[in-house]
């Protein structure tokens, strides 16, 4: 059985955790302390005295690359490379023998096992009081306190297949939480099935510090691959449970610090939000399902795990990158033709991705692009950049130059309007609605890219800069810019991509800022402006340049920012926290 206390002790020894004994408030104060520590690549934080709760709070468990590597040492040893080799090799005794340790790991560790305790490791509340939990309010305009690391377990009413996902939950009262289910993800699909049958959906929520459980809950696994099974494989041992929950028959995992059991109520919705999310903006108030908590279990010395999300880099960035690192050897097996793939956490992962693919025949790259956009959570990608060249996808400027040199505007630019969109992304015409853009750059270069702008001043543009060769960045505003007029500037045709932004200095300060400001503030169908060359056989052919309007639109939610009062309060107490 995993022990969070042992993990805390280990991180102390490694000087990767600091104990804070100064009393702190879960309303804004903890979040602001956490953000400052994350910004300085600091340690995990254990707050021992939290106002209004008997439970300590643990945050920033995953806040640096170093700490993530410490928490998952075995996953950096190439275990998924071995899986890829085994699965791609013709079956033979020698191959099986060579990978016998991997097979043994799979046979011995997969699944769950019941573990007997006397007494039980959990205390049980028949009349649960969620007000005792030190739920955090992270941003000043958040709608209330939230569970930010809930591991939400459901089973399909149709076939019983389980799902473990992470969906934020807003506390409404002693027994009720808002459940931010998204229809594109497993828990939301299960709730849809339950409502079709006019049934409540049994839901079990684990609050656990087990890094493998957390990693598994956010992993972009193929549909119907159980996350608990994946977790047991990652940690190389079965998950233990004490018993099955009343009514739902869900396993009560020993690795949890807190377990909430209850139901998502069919046909019932309640306004949830706002919430400062991992895109760095507030997701707005919308009606979402209601979770009614019927039982609350917790360890006697329970530690409440939490995270704070916001503008990158936060903990989710490092976890997401670790997942991509360990799963990357499997991409060519799951999606033949895809040699490398990266979603950019700098823009919240779903906004922009890139892939290196094979182009062995005409438009094979397009086939691979469509396959990527049909795969699980990757289907939420807005901007997808594709090349067949050997390029380091971690270097986005190099990737962008590689594509722009090769992209033929009459056939390599595909815009798909009216698609589903990430629920947290407000760049589309309505909630859950958006578009996709595929940008292909394969074969030999067809153009040289300019590296410096040497043209005249542009109407409505206050400053001009260059992100990388071929990508011009213009500082302007919604009120000043006239995009149709800009497209008539013939000297701009040599620049394949032109991005409109409010703040040139911030956008060009580093790659993270460019990715975040460009792709979280735009949608392919509504914000790409490209001259049309002609239309043939229902295919639109374009010509350069393409102007991407990444300006903040009036309909967009606000960027998250801490309030001045909280900043001053935390600054005045900073030395006390760490004395």
UniProtKB/Swiss-Prot annotation:
One of its GO terms (molecular function) is carboxy-lyase activity. Disulfide bonds: none annotated. Pfam families: UbiD (PF01977), UbiD_C (PF20696), UbiD_N (PF20695). It comes from the Bacteria. GO terms for cellular component: cytoplasm. InterPro entries: HBDC, UbiD, UbiD-like_C, UbiD-like_N, UbiD_Rift_dom. Belongs to the UbiD family. This is Uncharacterized protein TC_0359.
């Amino acid at each position: 059985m995993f022990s969070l206390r042992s993990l805390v002790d280990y991180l102390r020894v490694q000087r990767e955790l600091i104990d804070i004994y100064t009393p702190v408030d879960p309303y804004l104060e903890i979040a602001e302390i956490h953000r400052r520590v994350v910004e300085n690549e600091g340690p995990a934080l254990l707050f021992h005295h939290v106002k209004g709760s008997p439970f300590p709070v643990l945050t920033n468990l995953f806040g640096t690359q170093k700490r993530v590597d410490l928490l998952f040492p075995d996953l950096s040893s190439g275990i998924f490379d071995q899986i890829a080799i085994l699965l791609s090799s013709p079956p033979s005794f020698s191959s099986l023998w060579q990978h016998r340790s991997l097979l043994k790991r799979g046979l011995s560790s997969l699944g769950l096992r019941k573990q007997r305790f006397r007494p039980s490791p959990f205390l049980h509340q028949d009349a649960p009081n969620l007000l005792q939990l030190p739920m955090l309010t992270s941003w000043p305009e958040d709608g209330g306190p939230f569970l930010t690391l809930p591991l939400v377990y459901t089973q399909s009413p149709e076939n019983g297949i389980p799902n473990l996902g992470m969906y934020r939950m807003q506390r409404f009262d002693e027994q009720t939480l808002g459940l931010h289910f998204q229809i594109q993800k497993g828990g939301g699909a299960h709730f849809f099935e339950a409502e079709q049958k006019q049934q409540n959906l049994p839901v079990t929520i684990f609050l656990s510090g087990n890094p493998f459980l957390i990693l598994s809950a956010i992993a972009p696994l193929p549909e119907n691959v159980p996350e608990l099974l994946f977790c047991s494989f990652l940690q190389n041992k079965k998950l233990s449970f004490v018993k099955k929950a009343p009514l739902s028959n869900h396993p009560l995992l020993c690795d949890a610090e807190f377990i909430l059991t209850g139901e998502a109520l069919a046909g019932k919705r309640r306004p949830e939000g706002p919430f400062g999310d991992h895109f760095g903006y507030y997701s707005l108030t919308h009606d979402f399902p209601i979770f009614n908590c019927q039982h609350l279990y917790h360890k006697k010395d329970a530690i409440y795990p939490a995270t704070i999300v916001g503008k990158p880099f936060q903990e989710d960035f490092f976890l997401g990158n670790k997942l991509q690192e360990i799963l990357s050897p499997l991409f060519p097996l799951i999606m033949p033709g895809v040699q490398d793939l990266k979603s950019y956490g700098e823009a919240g992962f779903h906004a922009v991705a890139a892939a290196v693919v094979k182009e062995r025949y005409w438009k094979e790259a397009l086939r691979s692009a469509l396959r990527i956009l049909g795969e699980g959570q990757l289907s939420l990608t807005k901007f997808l950049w594709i090349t067949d060249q050997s390029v380091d996808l971690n270097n986005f400027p190099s990737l962008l130059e590689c594509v722009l040199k090769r992209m033929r505007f009459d056939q390599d630019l595909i815009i798909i309007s009216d698609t589903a969109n990430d629920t947290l992304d407000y760049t589309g015409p309505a909630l859950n609605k958006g578009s996709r853009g595929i940008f292909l750059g394969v074969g030999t270069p067809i153009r040289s890219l300019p590296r410096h702008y040497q043209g005249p001043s542009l109407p409505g543009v206050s400053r001009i800069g260059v992100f990388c060769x071929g990508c011009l960045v213009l500082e302007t505003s919604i009120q000043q810019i006239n995009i149709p007029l800009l497209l008539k500037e013939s000297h701009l045709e040599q620049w394949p991509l032109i991005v409109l932004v409010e703040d040139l200095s911030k956008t060009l300060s580093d790659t993270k800022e460019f990715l975040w400001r460009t792709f979280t503030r735009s949608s392919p169908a509504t914000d790409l402006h490209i001259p049309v060359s002609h239309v043939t056989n229902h295919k639109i052919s374009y010509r350069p340049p393409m102007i991407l309007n990444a300006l903040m639109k009036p309909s967009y939610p606000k960027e998250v920012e801490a309030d001045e009062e909280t900043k001053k309060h935390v600054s005045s107490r900073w030395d006390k926290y760490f004395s």
